[in-house]
Amino acid sequence: MNLSLNDVLELTGGKLIGETPEISISGVNTLSEACAGDISFLGNEKYFQDFLTTKASAVLVPPALPQYPEGPAYIEVENPSLAFNALVGHFMKAVTEFTPGIHPTAVVDPTARLNPEKVCIGPNAVIEAGVSIGDGTDIGPGCVIGKGVEIGEDCKFYARVVVRERCIIGNKVVIQPGAVIGGDGFGFLLNPETGRYDTIDQVGIVVLEDNVDIGANTTIDRARFGRTVIGEGSKIDNLVQIGHNCTIGKHTVICAQSGAAGSTTIGNYVTIAAQVGLGGHLSVGDKAVLAARTGVMSSLDGGQAYWGAPACPAKDAARQFAAIRKLPDALKEFMNLKKKAAEIEALIQQAMSGEQS
């Protein structure tokens, strides 16, 4: 598994700076924690001090750094973080190596369509009737795959993932532990005759397109009718709630603890920061950016950043926030002016009284 410098150059497309004796790379680590045999990277100028003191054997660096401390080998790349990720993938192969087979404790319905020599079904996993699983897919311990679910190739489901009946999962989809795909949408209707809430049946499905990543304990509800869709390449963080009939576009990122109410439409390449709330039956345009804790109560155009609750353009929200911070001083100044005005009014009244006498 060790890499030579030539191996690193080949994997990253980088250029070796200066002449460096041949070294062996045995692992990856941060600049501050790396030791001999490790390779690290400088992807942010905030870590330049760590770069100056790192004990790594090699470092991936951006072009034209002002200085290169003695010690490590330096490999220049356009994007150190992206290049480093390629090296991490190489070393992770040994940890995440795919081993096909069905564990003896797994329960696989005889009508399930899969090749036991090309898929991995972990301990205590349950594969129900009519499920289809593509080659190269790894179903982790304790997962439950409901009736009629279709799963593509090269997917990775970690422990205790639940995919309920008839949902469709594309190729190369990664789902972290505890996520639930296809739970019932939050649909209830108050019955005026009984004074109780009746459950509205949720008969649709969830579709996760190719290369989607779903974080731990995230829940994506099935549609009332039709489909809840997560578009190709989108990445959803931990503890996110996606309501029924939502449509998330391609390559959109949603950070932790955010939630979208039912029938929300989110465009392509949208960035949603942590703890954002989106009301139902609205849309967010392509390439919009929603700052943390933004509250979206009406539809938003794409191509700009938003902040606040209710959401407004980030520049306007920043001005509002700045104005609010000035309110205590403004109030103090107002009270001083009010006091002076009262004093002036008293003097005027006194002067007028003197003239009358």
What residue ranges belong to the model's regions?
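Terminal amphipathic alpha-helical/low-complexity segments used for targeting or macromolecular assembly
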Residues: 1-105, 172, 178-179, 184-199, ...
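Structural signal for interior beta-strand "rungs" in well-ordered beta-sheet cores
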Residues: 41, 101-313
